[in-house]
């Protein structure tokens, strides 16, 4: 059965994401953490392109969806997990191993849940923080420490705790914005230009602030919703 060459095009982006994820693992295993971390960020860019290319070329397929999920496990599950272990996790023996493994497991659960709920969930939000966002938050912490050296002593334990938190957030019911479905307008276009300018000037700091706000947004929104539900229950009681 002949295959339309156009179907290969978006999958090349997905395959490239896996390749960069593997390169990230290799660099991390040789303690070249800066390169390893930026490769995960580069994988995020490719991950955002494959779906768009598939939609633009009208080559969306079930194979592409499953292939993308497998790529995400490698690039955003295994790669940041091993970066975490080689960077600080090994100092804590089996605890470090367990934390690194749990991140991959929770990420795989997150992807499986996403695949079976794609047609029923709100297209403008994700249930649980997306695994690419969690992965980028991990590598940004490593890059920030490489530059500012804040992970020492007890803060290494906090970093492992942060990894566990990200894993829990991935399988939680906390909703996060889906920027792939955002509606473009002039105001948003200007904001994106400002953000890209900041990324050009201070890439690490700008990305860290943006991703930090993204992380906190979901948690604060969830807290407000819980407070509202409790208040309404007490009011109706």
From Swiss-Prot:
GO biological-process terms attached to the record: phospholipid biosynthetic process
Species name: Helicobacter pylori (strain J99 / ATCC 700824) (Campylobacter pylori J99)
Cellular component, GO, one term: plasma membrane
Catalytic activity: a CDP-1,2-diacyl-sn-glycerol + L-serine = a 1,2-diacyl-sn-glycero-3-phospho-L-serine + CMP + H(+)
Localization, UniProt: Cell membrane
Superkingdom classification of source: Bacteria
Transmembrane spans: 3-23, 25-45, 73-93, 95-115, 124-144, 150-170, 184-204, 207-227
Name recorded for this polypeptide: CDP-diacylglycerol--serine O-phosphatidyltransferase
Similarity annotation: Belongs to the CDP-alcohol phosphatidyltransferase class-I family.
Chief subcellular location: membrane
């Amino acid at each position: 059965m002949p295959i339309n060459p156009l179907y290969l095009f978006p999958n090349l982006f997905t395959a490239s994401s896996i390749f960069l994820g593997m390169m990230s693992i290799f660099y991390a295993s040789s303690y070249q953490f800066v390169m390893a971390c930026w490769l995960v960020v580069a994988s995020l860019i490719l991950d955002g392109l494959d779906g768009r290319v598939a939609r633009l070329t009208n080559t969306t397929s079930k194979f592409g969806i499953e292939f993308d999920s497998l790529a995400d496990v490698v690039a955003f599950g295994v790669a940041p997990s091993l970066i975490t272990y080689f960077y600080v996790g090994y100092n804590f023996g089996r605890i470090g191993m367990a934390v690194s493994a749990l991140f991959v497991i929770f990420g795989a659960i997150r992807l499986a849940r996403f695949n079976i709920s794609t047609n029923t969930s709100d297209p403008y939000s994700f249930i649980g923080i997306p695994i690419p966002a969690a992965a980028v938050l991990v590598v940004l912490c490593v890059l920030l420490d490489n530059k500012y050296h804040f992970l020492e002593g007890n803060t290494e334990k906090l970093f492992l705790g942060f990894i566990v938190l990200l894993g829990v957030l991935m399988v939680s019911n906390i909703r996060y914005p889906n920027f792939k479905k955002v509606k473009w307008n002039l105001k948003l276009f200007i904001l994106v230009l400002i953000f890209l300018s900041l990324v050009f000037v201070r890439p690490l700091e700008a990305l860290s602030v943006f991703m930090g706000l993204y992380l906190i947004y979901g948690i604060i929104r969830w807290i407000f919703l819980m407070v509202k539900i409790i208040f309404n229950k007490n009011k109706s009681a």
